[in-house]
Amino acid sequence: MKTETFSTEFGGRELRVEFTDLVDQAHGSCLVSYGDTVVLATAVMSKEAKDGADFFPLTVDFEEKFYATGKILGSRFQKREGRPTDEAILSGRIVDRTIRPLFDNWIRNDIQVVVTVLSIGEDDPDVLAVLAASIALGTSHIPWNGPVSAVRIGKNAEFEINPTYTQRNTDNYQMDLLVCGKEKKINMIEVGSSEVSEEDILKGMEMAEKELSKIQTFQEEIISKIGKKKISIPKPQLADEVITLFQEKIDPIFMSKVFSGNPGKDELSQLVTIWSEAIAHLDDNQQSLAQDFLQEKIDEVIHHESIANQKRPDGRGVDEIRPLYAKVGGISKIIHGAGTFYRGGTHVLSVLT
């Protein structure tokens, strides 16, 4: 078996990346280990674009296996794997949300990224899953604007980098911060905490940034040594007619519809309807590109107005929250309790018996 191994210090312990011919038909693969936790990541892309696809067909799977614990649980060992656990679903989403923004959204080739937990120790595999997926993609020929890194910052009495399950399962564990990003740009955050100060959150982010930078450099070194040359998937060209139609039909009403001051989405729906009618005579490919073009323009102006003018589409400033309302009871004397909570247009009724 051919192997090539790279290692670095990560949170005071060894992070190990191994390349073997175990999965040599995948376009990219690697084994990543941290303590006794080991994950395998594979990345594959179809040769041709998916017929009729008007979206980027990326699939991310996070697979847990019974054997990873080194135990046979229960009196009857089930040979079949069941549905994914909540933790597996959430870990898969962490990987997806981290890597997806770094693909060009005009790609129509099927891409699959599968992370399999081979061994589970005291370290959570979700951080390793992000790193393994990034390295598998980065060393493959699949076009991707990575690498991207991940780190967990915890706080008991002191801040800890990549705390173990034991360290996290204590009464005074105050903060669990998972940060993913690249080149001092963060594209995914998950945090669960008690009532910690803003200073603690900021310190955790600063610690995360330093670790992300170190792992970014580590990945870049690996990719420079063994990474394959990326293939090029040219961006489909938008017809000049689409630009002209946008200027005629959308430009005059664009800002008033996007920044309507209405917390609902009626105006945006109207904008999409007007645009869909304007491009209805175009072929399917140009219609798909035109819809992407509209969404890009909406995203662009929302980002610009939020940063430059501190303005949100519903009229709020960036430091304003939606109106809040809460009420106890008011449903019936028969039920034991009820509560109503509003945050803007989101209304929740909870009933207890």
Named regions from a protein language model:
Residues 141-259:
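Mobile "lid/hinge" segments at catalytic clefts and subdomain interfaces of large enzymes
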Residues 98, 128-140, 204, 211-212, ...:
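Stable alpha-helical structural segments in soluble proteins, enriched in small hydrophobic residues
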Residues 16, 40, 95, 105-152, ...:
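Glycine-rich anion/phosphate-binding loop at the beta-strand->alpha-helix junction
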Residues 1-12, 89-95, 132, 152-153:
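A short, contiguous, amphipathic alpha-helix enriched in charged residues
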Residues 67-81, 119-126, 225-248:
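Short, surface-exposed loop/turn segments at secondary-structure boundaries that line and modulate
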Residues 92, 126-130, 198, 202:
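Amphipathic alpha-helical transducer elements in NTP-driven molecular machines
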Residues 1-46, 50, 54-57, 234-353:
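Extended amphipathic alpha-helical scaffolds
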